[in-house]
Amino acid sequence: MRAPPSPRKSKSGHFFYLYFRLCQLFSGRKLKRRWHVHKLHIHQYNTRWNLSPLSEIHIEDMINEPSGLCPGSSKKKPLLIARFPKGCQESPRVYVLQRNNLSRLKLSKRKYALRFYHNEIFGNNLKRKDGSIHKVEHQQCAETVRKIKKVTANHADVKIIFHDKNTIRSDKLGGRSNKMQTRPSVLEEDVEEEVSSVYIRFCDDHSLRVKDYHSLHRHSKKSSKEKRNNQEIGKSKLLGKLFEEETSRQNKGVEKKLDTIVIQKFQNYPIVSFSRVI
């Protein structure tokens, strides 16, 4: 039985390809894209920006607009991505999507790559003169985004990855020891109430209380004395088992093998020493 023949290739695809190439040639799309990337690299080393503070919060600074609402000219500009991995109190990480130079030399099949964008101009006003960071506010992230857009919006399609999305923010976790040191007269009941009021927040809409989940709350209930006692009991049980195994081997007359642990207990001192037989 003969195999079916391969479908015929339409010649109309060649005309569409030539038409697309001619449009790119006369419109200068590649030259414009390279010009935008060049201007972005010039801006990243220019630190003389007089950016006025925000008078009000804009909604486009807190969310990413859908692609249908974005202007058509933004699609012709290089993509600039800014993200806040450490929160709004730290400088953002900014990247520019541009053509990979190795792909032109046929050394790599990766046509585009994300290049790090110098971001000191976006994080200068986040710290005070004494080195301390300003108090985190809701509009602080919007101010940084507005600053990025003012500098780069004319030559890039700016997209923001906010730190609140898919990130767990925790408050007061692990701070019980600090509270006990600063306030030694605090009762244990008050401390347990403070621990029970701990919340883990997922974004701004969802949160859970540590007290409602036994697996999260059981470690905070144990005091320091109980933890030390449990550790001492666990060590004594382990040493007792090893000592019993060694004595049983000696009573049975089993020959000692290489790399075995010998336990010697001193009469006058409550010390158990470990030694290796070579």
UniProtKB/Swiss-Prot annotation:
GO terms for biological process: ascospore formation; ascospore wall assembly. Coiled coil: none annotated. GO terms for cellular component: prospore membrane; spore wall. Keywords: Sporulation. The keyword Transmembrane does not apply. Its main location: other. It is found in: Spore wall. May be involved in a late step of spore wall assembly. This is Outer spore wall protein 1.
